[in-house]
Regions:
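Non-heme Fe(II) oxygenase metal-center motifs and adjacent flexible, charged/small-residue loops
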Residues: 1-224
Length: 224
């Protein structure tokens, strides 16, 4: 698969790896007990990881039911359960680092890994709140690592009111926690022009087998 990666001043410098979390993580409280954490540059020298994932992951297209017709999901998808080997050891390092950092709050490790490939600006994901790995009244965390082109990541409260739009770049980490999946919606909108492809890597706790049927955005959730 031939894809264009957005040029990055830092993505090809240094050694591919996982940066420290700790004090480098910025928490932004939202309403209704929701919050997001941001850690720019969590994956260092990320160009290599983008290239490996784009070429080696078994990407597939899915379709979903919308009213009385079936439509193409506007992005390519892949998923790995706890029992499956991840496509690059840096993903194992990232999962371990996230599990250690959020152990006290989450109470369990991150397990499943979902991936989305946004081939260009016409690929997107609609407003939604994830149902994967949470109950109707329970909370969970979703940790998202972005590779490739910088894309807008929008969040807005379900109850109405102002939201926010973040520009998430190459190697950046965004974590949604607290009540975020119940009380807020998030999405990646289409853009008229885009400098390249984007890969989103989502780390979630338990229920990894659900990934097989829910990454397309069915009743159990969507992937970012």
């Amino acid at each position: 698969m031939s894809l264009v990666i957005q040029p990055s001043l830092f993505g090809s410098l240094g050694e591919l790896g996982v940066a420290q979390l700790g004090a480098a993580v910025e928490r932004r409280p939202l309403s209704d007990g929701a919050w997001i954490d941001l850690r720019p540059g969590f994956i260092t020298a990320a160009d290599e990881l983008f290239d490996v994932l784009a070429a080696s992951v078994p990407w597939h297209e899915e379709r979903m039911r919308m009213y009385d017709t079936t439509v193409r999901v506007p992005r390519l998808l892949a998923g790995y359960t706890q029992a499956e080997t991840l496509p690059h050891p840096v993903l194992d390092e990232a999962r371990c680092a996230l599990s250690a950092h959020y152990a006290a709050e989450l109470g369990e490790p991150f397990v499943s890994v979902g991936l989305c490939l946004y081939r260009d600006g016409s690929d997107s994901v609609a407003w939604h709140g994830d149902r994967i790995a949470r109950e109707s009244t329970g909370d969970t965390m979703v940790a998202i690592v972005s590779l490739g082109a910088t894309r807008a990541f929008g969040l807005r409260p379900k109850s109405g009111g102002p939201g926010l739009r973040l520009q998430v770049g190459h190697g950046d980490l965004l974590v949604m926690g607290g009540s975020c999946q119940r009380t807020w919606l998030h999405g990646v909108p289409k853009v008229a022009s885009c400098l390249g492809a984007r890969i989103s890597i989502q780390f979630r706790p338990h229920w990894g087998d659900q990934l097989r049927t829910s990454t397309a955005g069915g009743p159990d959730g969507k992937a970012q």
